[in-house]
């Protein structure tokens, strides 16, 4: 059934009118990553003196919102985040009433259905096609469908800059919205970062572990860029990943990614959320080889394991001598979230020919002093992201070692060998003092 001009006209309203659908005590989802709703969010901020007890739910926003970055006397907004990014951390720093929920991304649908039910969902979407269907864009397919199952009110923020992306139930008809507003904001970008000398050394340790025909999972940052640049001589790679990033798209454009031999969803680059530059977003638009999936699908270890030669590459903030990772918090300071690290660590190892790799610099420098990221023990309060029973390969600029099934003593020795030379003697002495080696 073709959309008529009246279908859109009847739903179209001003942002100021649309946010009048938000009532006291509502829980409002405003977006995640690149799928955020700046027009609706700013309009909601303007109602700060009219409303009471509003919970704003989001995750890893790539654009600031006044709901998080500004405070006002007696303002009603509380933040609930599933994944802390720079703007969520700003909200906590300036004193915005805030809460954080720690969960594996594979559990997001269960959380929204049973615990985190929303009253109102703001949806950032593409322009409608001839049938009145919009796409949830570059990242919305990861969560929007769960929200629609429970939300009382649905408000679309249509944007001609948002790519029309295919995927797992990634389409929504405008007639099912309660209100529609327009936006012309650019889709927020995330720079991948240039690899430095240490990152190049780490990538050199990892690339030999990636064979032709492997299915890869990468994140964003200099390491992904370095690895991606070294995979241009590989053939028939596949993508099944929590995140789609520019280095992956470059491999797709270059013909290194064909998705022919994954053994699961062949022909499709499957991902949950995307963050990159405009060139990447343009490539995603109406690209039938790209598939935006639910978090509960793309991060389900039982789905991940179906991909042959699944190579999962994740990072950590610190690793202890057992090989346990601290990826989202140090001490009592929450920095980000566990995301899908453990989902992919397990799924990759269950895959036929798969491998899980945790990679990081061995040390960092702060105020002119060097500190080890390989720790004897973590600071008090540090949560474990990947436990020692799940860890497999660990890579630093000093090597890459498979820890799986090693004795504790051999594991400790291996981790010390991956540390910066300045700290190896100290780590060895501490390990001997408690009879670890």
What is each PLM-predicted segment?
Residues 1-437:
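Conserved alpha/beta enzyme-core scaffold
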